């Protein structure tokens, strides 16, 4: 990123143009409005390095521009082999280069906003598991939570309009519309889930940039409203990127809310409001009454409808009591449970017992959705009975065991924070027996006969419990150390959810 910093001659907090128009400005307007170009496509499949430089992208755009290969037309969009499903090499280079370039100013703004802050040094905060210690500390003292599913925009043009509040660059918006036009039917009023899935899989970096911009716009307004409703200011809100006309839009929303809620036009003060989000799912928790949660529910619905033109029904936000309902978040079922404890107290000659029942966050492995994921991956049937998995005939026994072992360790690693290990033991049993049946099928035998024939040390590593490694490494490990390992452990090196765990 340092090599591109020289292109940004203006103050990065006052710059309205992205980096790429300095390189591609003369071609972006023609790409978006070139309806009269000849209908020819460049279909040569030329190999290239995945780490394509900006020079390759610039040369590609120059060549396509000079040879009239850039064309956008609503009539022949379905027959256009250049973009289509994004299998064409030049489309991939062009869109990836575009995504890389537009990320640079945001990256530099983030680094500048965090300059000198201690949070930069804590790289472990990137871990998904770093959220759960926060939940363990805050949620036992809260009463209600709102399970929020952030809706997708109804049309890709909304994403372009969202970026207009941050960027004053017409050529940037032209080229952005060019890409979005080829990935979807612009004449359609809505985006189907299928088109979103194709778009996200064909160019994940480009899709994540647009989606993160949409989420950043939504959270910048939401956190502003949250700050108005709290006596305490958020320290993390300073990381948000600069927005154009932010406060003018907030004043407009204040008028909208005042008109929609004439009886209570002001915000209710709540110093115990907490917000957590991962991808498109978020949780809003509070210690106050359900009245405040329902008011926030109305705020969010009006925010999506008035600002993003996204229809969201109030039923999409579920308000539950933490002590009676579980939260399905980050592939865990989390709930607040009372942890009864008896404390013996003695004063002089008198002794008495105190019954204490503090709240505790309970995290459980979602066994039914996880078995459904294993059944979909052909490790078991719908009721959880292990079955043999089809494998290539050229795989050795060691490679098959190693693959099953890798899956088992990943799941055990991710669900190490579960407060009850019984469900995880069942998942391990399914994977282990599926491995045995797979090997028995390969050797044209039964599972029982195969286990009798092989050496006892053949599955030693696979059947060794993770807790046994403590005894192997530290033979004289104390009881407290082993008890600590058998409890909940949150790892700070997990940056994504396992595919089998991601049942959302």
From Swiss-Prot:
Keyword Glycoprotein: no
Annotated keywords: Chloroplast, mRNA processing, Plastid, RNA-binding, tRNA processing
Main subcellular location: plastid
Any single GO CC term annotated in Swiss-Prot or TrEMBL for this entry: chloroplast
GO biological process: mRNA processing; RNA splicing; tRNA processing
A GO molecular-function annotation: RNA binding
Cell compartment(s), UniProt: Plastid, Chloroplast
Biological role stated in the UniProt entry: Usually encoded in the trnK tRNA gene intron. Probably assists in splicing its own and other chloroplast group II introns.
Family statement: Belongs to the intron maturase 2 family. MatK subfamily.
HAMAP family xref list: MatK
Matching PANTHER family: MATURASE K (PTHR34811:SF1)
The name this protein goes by in its record: Maturase K
Organism: Quercus robur (English oak)
